[in-house]
Amino acid sequence: MEEILNDSVVTDELERFEKKYNQERKEGAVSTTTQFEYAYCMVRSDFASDMKTGLVLLEDLFVRHPEGRRDYLYYMAIGHTRLKEYSEAMKHAQAFLEIEPNNQQVIALEELIGKRMDIEGMKGVAKATGAVLVVGGILGLGLALLKK
């Protein structure tokens, strides 16, 4: 699962699908396939702004093209995980599992998202604890200086 989350799009591939997407847009109608291919590339970009654009395109497809919802949910879960938006990623993974409850790949993704949420939670607790210790140390130093 880590390989999928760490998979980055090659610049040439992104440029090719971006060109195709923009050409169809210019002509007035972007096909579902073209929009999906471009969104898939964008979600695999190394840049957060590209990933967010890819997610917007996938969300649009999710609304307009019900036949592909399962795939769109999966790649939205991937995109949100890559952006460290774990609660959104979890929602999409769980929605996918409502459609296909035994999909091992998405079950593994859901577990990974859960682990990352736990890690981020622990980091938050560690930062808060560190801040409390710093403030406590400053107050202790201040009180010690006042007593002198």
Describe the role of every protein-language-model region:
Residues L14, A48-M51, Y86, N103, ...:
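TPR-repeat structural position
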Residues R25-A77, L83:
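Alpha-helical adaptor scaffolds
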Residues F36-A39, R70-Y75, K91, Q105-E110, ...:
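Alpha-solenoid helical repeat scaffolds
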Residues D118-K148:
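C-terminal single-pass membrane-anchor helix
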